[in-house]
Amino acid sequence: MFSLRALSGVVTRSLVRAPHRRTMSHAARLLPHRVPQKKGPERDPSTLSNYEHFKPTNTTVCLKVDWTDQKLAGSVTYDLTVENSPKNLVLDTSYLDIQEVQVNGHKADFSIGERHNIFGSPLTITLPPNSGDKLQVKIAYSTTPSCTALQWLTPEQTAGKKAPYFFSQCQAIHARSVMPAFDTPSVKSTFDIEIESDHPVVASGLPIKSSNDTGKFVFRQKVPIPAYLFALAGGDLDSAPIGPRSDVYSEPCDLHKCQYEFEADTEKFINAAENIVFPYEWEKYDVLVLPPSFPYGGMENPNITFATPTLVSGDRQNVDVIAHELAHSWSGNLVTNCSWEHFWLNEGWTVYLERRIVGALEGEQQRHFSAIIGWNALEESVKLMSRDPVQESYTQLVVDLKPNGGADPDDAFSSVPYEKGSTFLFFLETEIGQAKFDPFVKHYFKHFRYKSLDTYQFIDCLFDFYANDKEVTDKLNAIDWEKTLFAPGLPNKPKFDTTLADECYSLASRWKDASDASAFSAKDIASFNSSQMVVFLITLSEYEGKDGFSWANKKELISNMGDIYSLANSSNPEVIAKWYSIAILAKVESEYPKLADWLATVGRMKFVRPGYRALNSVDPKLAKETFEKNKDFYHPICRDMVSKDLQ
């Protein structure tokens, strides 16, 4: 799926666009049939707004949380600079109740267009004649029960069972269901956020003043961010420090567990990232641990990462997700893809930085070990997606979301932009040499800071940076850019350091060749960390189908393995998920209801979607019954995706 800053005097910077392309850019030379003949980044096909004509200088959101009717009600106000004198302002909306619109303090005419099944309804606001190049537009509205970004939980659905809870998930195009918006990563704005609530609230900004007594919670986001990074959550929340500039928020009953999980590493991650890129610009980096139905591992909401409770395993083995979300403070939040077609610029860079952070703190062998796990995830995604022509097209690095009136970015979501993107950046580092590549990393993020860009601008920036280095330029020119960016499937596999994986491979090979479990014991994995357990189980799965091998012929062996290593009882959900995957391959029927029960407790799509697909492959009736029984537990995004998976 899926961080922050603190900076003053940044409003004027939010108006700076990415530099215009030259008449013949490097990208146009290398990709003559791909690069659009226009200046600036490509238009985002996933928005109905006419954002090209407007630049927000600030956005003010004032909302009241209606806990009884489960909705947000209030207003959003845009301070805009106008270009080219448009007659109308068009914003994205989805399932919103629009009550009134004011332009420069006066009521304005507006209309809501016919609903597009993916992109929602355009809100068209008539602008007064001769309104000038500065506008203030205020829209009074409320959300509705059909809102796709919000999930509301009853007290019984929370850990503490004391108060209701709600949270938002706006990426990719769900901000339009929370407020009328330029719902595109191409548009950024600073934010003032004022929330009235009977329960504590956190938001994607720095807390200015908050009071449980008055029920008023005020936040300021001083760095311009796109709408998909707007975030709110509320409920029975408390906080504890996990570093000199970081706090963790959770329900009080889980607070000490969450504090323990993150306090050892958070500041180390920040320091390492600052050394790789440049100083952290967001002032505070906090983490909110959400209820189990949160659909992602983490979401990089500025100033407060939203995190799945599956990270809190008690062994501090899953905190690399925090390194990932923190890395978004530079890649994604500070420098942003202009559209979801270029999503790899967000996630590929973030995975690359995440693993650089891991390498800086734990050594290059651990960095490569993490990359091996990522490569396995990429292979799995490409194999699954290659069964369908549309899905296969989403295994390209740069995807096309324009066909057939527009595709849903959520449908294109997979590990591909993460892992194929980071693999490409690792390839560049290897080809150029880390000593030469590191200065480019810093330059790239400084050059595009506060801006949104496309892949072609990335290419231009890369070539421009090495313009006086013939050796590097020759290597860049030798790359098959068409294949790299637009060919579906797997890229060339990098040469990884397998030192930390070799023990896992060896143990997996022993199990493959074994006729019974008599030679195995829990001592086999006594020295393994959770990541090594994951690689061991992945390696077992990869034997399936090779040279006619099938784990279904070794059902009893796999069942015994689960018992010997207590895999279903692991405290780490990554291990549990991979265990059920191999158990399904071996058709261990006793594990089917256990998997169904587990799926009722986790909402993270990384586990939920593969889990349901696996269960559906062996027991469709149980899979569908389990989903029907638990579908209201899942976030709307997750619920929709699993429903499609089971069709």
UniProtKB/Swiss-Prot annotation:
Chief site of localization: cytoplasm
InterPro entries assigned: Aminopeptidase_N-like_N (IPR045357), Aminopeptidase_N-like_N_sf (IPR042097), ARM-type_fold (IPR016024), LTA4H (IPR012777), LTA4H_cat (IPR049980), M1_LTA-4_hydro/amino_C_sf (IPR038502), M1_LTA4H (IPR034015), Peptidase_M1 (IPR001930)
Biological process, per Gene Ontology: cytoplasm to vacuole targeting by the NVT pathway; lipid metabolic process; peptide catabolic process; protein catabolic process; proteolysis
Annotated Zn(2+) binding sites: 324, 328, 347
Keyword entries, A-Z: Cytoplasm, Hydrolase, Metal-binding, Metalloprotease, Nucleus, Protease, Zinc
Cofactor, free-text remark: Binds 1 zinc ion per subunit.
Keyword hit for Cell wall biogenesis/degradation: no
Annotated catalysed reactions: an epoxide + H2O = an ethanediol
Record PROSITE patterns: ZINC_PROTEASE
Gene Ontology cellular-component annotations: cytosol; fungal-type vacuole lumen; multivesicular body; nucleus; NVT complex
Gene Ontology molecular function: any one: aminopeptidase activity
Active site per UniProt: 325 (proton acceptor), 418 (proton donor)
Residues the entry annotates as binding substrate: 169-171, 295-300
Gene3D superfamilies assigned to the protein according to its UniProt record, in alphabetical order: 3.30.2010.30, Neutral Protease Domain 2 (1.10.390.10), Peptidase M1, leukotriene A4 hydrolase/aminopeptidase C-terminal domain (1.25.40.320), tricorn interacting facor f3 domain (2.60.40.1730)
Coiled coil: none
EC number: 3.4.11.-, 3.3.2.10
Family: Belongs to the peptidase M1 family.
Function: Aminopeptidase that preferentially cleaves di- and tripeptides. Also has low epoxide hydrolase activity (in vitro). Can hydrolyze the epoxide leukotriene LTA(4) but it forms preferentially 5,6-dihydroxy-7,9,11,14-eicosatetraenoic acid rather than the cytokine leukotriene B(4) as the product compared to the homologous mammalian enzyme (in vitro).
Protein name: Leucine aminopeptidase 2
